[in-house]
A protein has these predicted regions:
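Short pre-catalytic strand/loop immediately N-terminal to key active-site residues, enriched for Gly-Thr
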Residues: 34
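Alpha-helical transmembrane segments of integral membrane proteins
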Residues: 13-14, 18-21, 37-280
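Transmembrane alpha-helices
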Residues: 1-31
Length: 280
């Protein structure tokens, strides 16, 4: 019925299957090394589980940085138009024109030089690694807001022509009240969907950056560092492949779960999706 047609049924079934598989893995790990051990004898499943924390931290903190920028600039650009719209469009067009990996890599390499020159500011290697992780989140945040900003601008351009917005302006309602009470609630479904999709993209971005050597500190457990270490182990005879497989499986599962959640959010909050389900 409506739950099946909206995709919520499939999301629930897939979520139950994923939870069942991971619960079985965690229970079995009490007795066996499910994914084997690393070259120094560490349990690969434990490394993979701890890497989830790094992925969630990067996704969450990066979203905290990028979301306010995207929302404020996006709805202001679409609502006010003219000069403000031109300036904001110029900013996000310029940022989008620069290849993302090159921009982030250059910023992270500059950060590494800065951390090396001020190593005495940190009392331990853990503090330096945490600062590097935080700054990577900051860099990803200030460079990753453009796509959401563009979508919010387009949606705001349509909403500002609605009758209730025109009536609010006629009654003398301030622009700030219109933005906060009328426009922002009507674009939140886009914000939620894109935020969840971008979360999975950030997990993949961390893996790519760590693989090429400009990601989190090598001492920090992450899927990117696991894949980078497994690359050398794959050249052995016999090849040690299970560390690579574990990182890939967990990364794939997290990205899949995020996309399934995004579909559920879209089905729940997108007015067009609701109308399609009701008419069918």
């Amino acid at each position: 019925t409506a739950l099946k047609e909206s995709g919520g049924f499939h999301s629930i079934i897939t979520t139950i299957i994923l939870f069942t598989i991971f619960a079985a893995l965690i229970y079995t790990s009490n007795y066996y090394h499910v994914f084997g051990t690393s070259k120094i004898g560490e349990d690969v499943l434990y490394q993979t589980m701890k890497s989830i924390r790094t992925g969630i931290i990067i996704g969450t903190i990066t979203t905290i940085f990028s979301l306010p920028i995207a929302i404020i600039l996006g709805i202001c650009s679409g609502y006010f138009g003219r000069t403000i719209d031109d300036i904001i469009q110029y900013i996000y067009t310029t940022i989008s024109a620069i290849p993302g990996i090159l921009l982030i890599s250059a910023a992270v390499l500059s950060l590494q030089v800065w951390l090396g020159r001020h190593a005495n500011w940190f009392s331990s290697m853990e503090e330096s690694a945490d600062m590097r992780l935080f700054m990577i989140c900051f860099i990803l945040g200030i460079t990753g807001w453009t796509s959401l900003c563009r979508l919010l601008r387009g949606e705001t351009l349509k909403i500002r022509e609605m009758d209730y917005i025109t009536a609010a302006k006629t009654l003398g309602v301030s622009n700030s009240s219109i933005l906060y009470k009328h426009i922002l609630p009507n674009v939140m479904h886009i914000v939620l969907i894109i935020t969840v999709i971008d979360f999975s993209s950030l997990v993949l971005a961390e893996a790519v950056l760590s693989y090429i050597g400009v990601g989190v500190d090598p001492s920090t457990m992450s899927w990117g560092n696991m894949i980078n270490s497994a690359r050398l182990e794959m050249a052995r005879e016999p090849a040690i492949w299970w560390s690579l497989a574990a990182a890939f499986i967990f990364m794939f599962s997290l990205v899949l779960a995020a996309n399934i959640f995004a579909d559920g959010v879209r089905a729940a909050f997108d007015p067009r999706e609701k109308s399609n389900v009701e008419t069918s």
